[in-house]
């Protein structure tokens, strides 16, 4: 972008202001969006994108919202994406602040999904609208901003639909990074282990096989024998138990 384009962009940024970004973020936070129930958030995101001047806005069959700004028919395709969903807030009475209140205190916004990733989504939407105001002709290609669903539960399928639609040359994901540009991801493998015991009454455990005891032994064995790899650039791998389910029988 030449000097004229940079000057235009700075003027556009100055015209929006901090309050517009804060207000958009608060509106997102005030709309709960538990994974699989993101409809209210999605409708608001689509509405906002249209108001911000996106050239096209679609909500796909999964519920993802994808807005597009076209600078030219040819050129690179950039995708900015952040999730709209979050895990359940649980008992809201246990929170020190109402999780969907979007309160501001000491220059911080408090709310479920503020950093993961509604704050990023608000920033991306406004940033894209600012770029559209550039009239220098220096920007080429297409810019997509996507609000993704099911990130907490079904991300591989739902997010793939965004990628298939936008067909991007480059992607920026709104994961929290301490305002650092992170350019790699360790990847993830989900491993399910089923352990079957033999039922017995708790007063006579010697007649059965306690699957929970076997699971404890298995986890100890796994941690003692398997060390996650370390990459010079990406750092240490991790191994963590995330879910444990057992039979509903208590005796």
Region locations from a protein language model:
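Acidic-enriched catalytic cores of C-N bond-cleaving enzymes acting on peptides and small amides
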Residues: 202-250
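Metal-dependent peptidase/peptidase-like ectodomains
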Residues: 169-170, 180-214
């Amino acid at each position: 972008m030449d000097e004229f384009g940079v000057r235009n962009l700075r003027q556009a940024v100055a015209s929006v202001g901090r309050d517009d970004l804060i207000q958009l973020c608060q509106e997102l936070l005030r709309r709960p969006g538990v994974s699989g129930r993101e409809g209210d958030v999605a409708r608001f995101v689509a509405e906002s994108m249209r108001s911000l001047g996106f050239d096209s806005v679609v909500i796909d069959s999964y519920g993802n919202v994808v807005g597009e700004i076209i600078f030219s028919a040819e050129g690179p395709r950039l995708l900015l994406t952040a999730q709209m969903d979050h895990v359940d807030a649980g008992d809201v009475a246990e929170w020190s602040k109402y999780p969907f209140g979007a309160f501001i205190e000491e220059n911080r916004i408090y709310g479920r999904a503020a950093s993961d990733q509604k704050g990023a989504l608000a920033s991306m939407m406004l940033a894209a609208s600012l770029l559209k105001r550039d009239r220098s002709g220096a920007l080429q290609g297409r810019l997509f901003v996507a609000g993704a669903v099911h990130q907490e539960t079904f991300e591989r399928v739902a997010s793939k639909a965004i990628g298939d639609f936008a067909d991007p040359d480059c992607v920026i994901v709104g994961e929290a990074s301490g305002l650092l540009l992170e350019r790699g991801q360790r990847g993830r493998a989900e491993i399910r282990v089923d352990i079957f015991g033999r039922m017995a009454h708790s007063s006579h455990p010697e007649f059965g096989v306690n699957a929970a005891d076997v699971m404890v032994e298995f986890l100890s064995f796994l941690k003692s024998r398997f060390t996650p790899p370390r990459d010079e650039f990406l750092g240490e791998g991790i191994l963590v138990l995330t879910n444990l389910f057992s039979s509903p029988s208590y005796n």
